Amino acid sequence: MSAAEWQTKATELDRKLVKQQNVFIKVKASQTAATHASFVVAYNIAKQSKSFCDGEFVKQCMLDVADQVCPEQRKKFEEVSLSRRTVARRIEAIDEDLTAQLKKRVPSFQLFSLALDESTDIDDTAQLLIFVRGISENFKITEELLSMESMKDTTTGEYIFECVENALHKMQLPWQKMASVTTDGCPSLTGKKVGLLKRLGDRVTEVDCTRELIFLHCIIHQEVLCKSVLDMKHVVDPVVKIVNFIRARGLNHRQFITLLKDCGCDHSDVLYHTAVRWLSLGKVLRRVWDLKTEILLFLEMKGKQTEYPQLRKSEWLSDLAFAIDIFEHMNELNTRLQGKGTFAHEMYSTVKAFQVKLKLFSRQLSQNIITHFPTLETMASQIMSTEKYTNMISALENEFARRFADFQKLAAEFAILSSPFTTDFEKAPDALQLELIDLQCDSTLKEIFQTESIDKFYASLNESKFANLRKMATKLLVLFGSTYICEQTFSTMNINKSKLRSNLTDVHVQSLLRISTSDMQPQFKQLVDNFDRPQMSH
């Protein structure tokens, strides 16, 4: 064979080798894409609190779509593994990835705070949720689920402390950087001698005797508890009894709905009230008020009108009208306080504004002015005296002042944080006075304050020139004003671990909760790379 023939043969063999290599590369790329897709679908299943088995349903839908849109590509869709077992493994891997990302951020935290709350799941197991909010040197805030701890045997303050200590240790969060703890105020968390907060405070002092942990009682929970001082039992009990009579029996309920349709009412039904949800109570009272004429007619049809004489008494109807108005005011406050990532000083400002409104209500009611009580205003001609309403508002005002005492201690610092350019620097702490003067005389910084978010504004301050202002802002911006994120996550837990899915393990529940609440995005490429041999589906 001549040299030229050898060269031709070598070129041909080389071309065949490249062709074979390309086949393997294409197969590998196809498998990698299929694995990536299965991770994305599993992530969305977890994010939306769907069952692991839904992966198989999603795949069947994908194949049906492929058959209609691109039948020649069906094989690629078949390669996407979405069996229940695969979805579970993918979710576990995503959880591990998000946990690792959080762990990488921890060293950058200047300070961190915790939000704690406990509740029971469908199996009657007490679950403790621990959320962490960390703030970095450049004021980047991270708010993530730290841990879900299952408390099978006991929920004492000492045991909960051990759970928190274990969670901090796993994430390598240093005690000396803990700024505050926010709870819903249950006894096991707030005990003065052996409660969790006492143990946490002692531990922080052991590590750094100059530091004092800030303890806050959830603003939203406090606001709800304030309603308990309103003497409304004589209003609520008959309303609940009426609603139960209408809705408890199917025949009564159907007949009432038919009556509403015949009368051409705007509402199609009355609402149930659950004792633990004050928001629902306000809506129930409003609905009963709007349908009081139809309810009276229905009770007469049933021969039950004598059992509910309140519906014909103007004094009781006036009390119902007042209850509706004050509950609507408070429900509006409650709604404004809700939301993830809200700063504590913003929530406190909202509460302070409501306290000022209460003062106005009290003063005006004492003068028989009911402008801000529109439902009560419809009963104006039948109201003999507004004294009892004035007393209720005064009691509510006092209860707000009492329950928000822990936030009141921070009021002066909150004022400086939120209004540094208008605060009186002479009344500020000595360490902040000179910095406030420099700040208030800087027109550039004033413009930044007016255009940027509060965290970005404080991040823009020179570290050496405004060291104390930055330190104060770091401490206050890292606070949890409420345990709303815990309450929201418990709702997600109840969706995931329901009667139909009660066999979910605690590990899987924690994975689902972390994924559904996290602001971080999974590193899909890294997750796929970690799977050396992507599996084909079945």
Predicted regions and their residues:
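Alpha-helical structural modules in large enzymes and assemblies
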Residues: 1-538
